Amino acid sequence: EKWQLVLNRHEEIRRKLKPHKLRPLTIVITRDIRGCKDVAEKFKAFLKEETGKSREQIEDQVLVIHSDAPDLPRLAGVNNGSSKVEWILSVSMLNEGWGVKRVFQIVPHEKRAFESRLLIAQVLGRGLRVPDGWKGIQPEVTVFNHDKWADDIRHLVYEVMEFEKRIPTFP
């Protein structure tokens, strides 16, 4: 199952982050609000079953983010070292910007949630921020794709990354 693979990768990332004293953060991108709510409920049920954690513990770890989400105010505290959030389920196009500095896995839930250069740039931008106090080699971000559309998304990601490489930076 897809969620099992995503959870396994999340736990692998957790082990790698232990020396840095960081919690892993995975973002799941959905196409719209209805899809976000639906995926969030199914994912929370999956986590509860797989981890044996209580509903309250799962609610502490999972944020659901869209324009009318009750979790939106909690987003501001995700960079706080005491935050228990490890999963963010979000619509692909948010009106408001947000910056989280410990995203290590990005999961497009469906191809349409991730099929334009703008969306990919926006979402990758969330994952390519280096956590505060990070020392050592550059952290990795995993983009988890479905085999059926991985090549299409890989092509768009490479286009975005090539574009990003050509932007000059000045002191």
Language-model region placement:
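Helicase-associated low-complexity regulatory tails and linkers flanking the ATPase motor
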Residues: 1-25, 31-86, 102, 112-171
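Conserved helicase core region in the C-terminal RecA-like lobe
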Residues: 87-112
